[in-house]
From Swiss-Prot:
Gene Ontology BP terms: NAD biosynthetic process
NCBIfam families: nicotinate (nicotinamide) nucleotide adenylyltransferase, PRK00071.2-2, PRK00071.2-4
Source species, domain of life: Bacteria
EC number(s) per entry: 2.7.7.18
Protein's name in the database: Probable nicotinate-nucleotide adenylyltransferase
Similarity field: Belongs to the NadD family.
Gene3D superfamilies with a match to the protein in the record: HUPs
Alphabetical keyword list: ATP-binding, NAD, Nucleotide-binding, Nucleotidyltransferase, Pyridine nucleotide biosynthesis, Transferase
Biological source species: Caulobacter sp. (strain K31)
General function of this protein: Catalyzes the reversible adenylation of nicotinate mononucleotide (NaMN) to nicotinic acid adenine dinucleotide (NaAD).
Alphabetized GO MF terms: ATP binding; nicotinate-nucleotide adenylyltransferase activity
Amino acid sequence: MRVGLFGGSFNPAHEGHAHVAETAMHRLKLDKVIWLVSPQNPLKSSHETRPLAERMAGVRRWARGGGMIVSDAETRLGSQYTIDTLRVLRARYPGVKFVWIMGADSLATFHRWRGWTQIMREVPVAVISRPWAALKARTSPAARRFAHARWPSSAAAILADATAPAWVYLTGPLNFASSTALRGRQTKG
């Protein structure tokens, strides 16, 4: 079983998130993509984070199609950090080939995540191009530190079979939706 893990606060979820998940599903030849809705992103302010139930409902609207699963596993596990979640899931499901999925905007700030180097060594990582983030992502501390482990995009279909560290940067049609922009419009309107 090849499973993509797409974590985020999804505050709110939007078509750009769906684009990332669908791109990963197709290009990585995954059986499932699990959207891990974070109870609270430790790098973001809690006062602007919508309630978990509201964000879960929003993700369900966008996580359509076969193989898309919405999960509050981090809440149930009491896990606040991706590295802890990955370790628990890998221990519980040793036969599953997990891939961490993120947008390029997340790779640009990945070095701020707790245990980011361990994440890269725990599971293969797929980075999906996002508008305005390509240069920052490709020159980020994480991209530089793990340049030796970057695979060509033509090998994306076998990334799940790789031993970490291994990562791929996938380009293609871009989706310009943004949670930040959506929140800005909602506060103004």
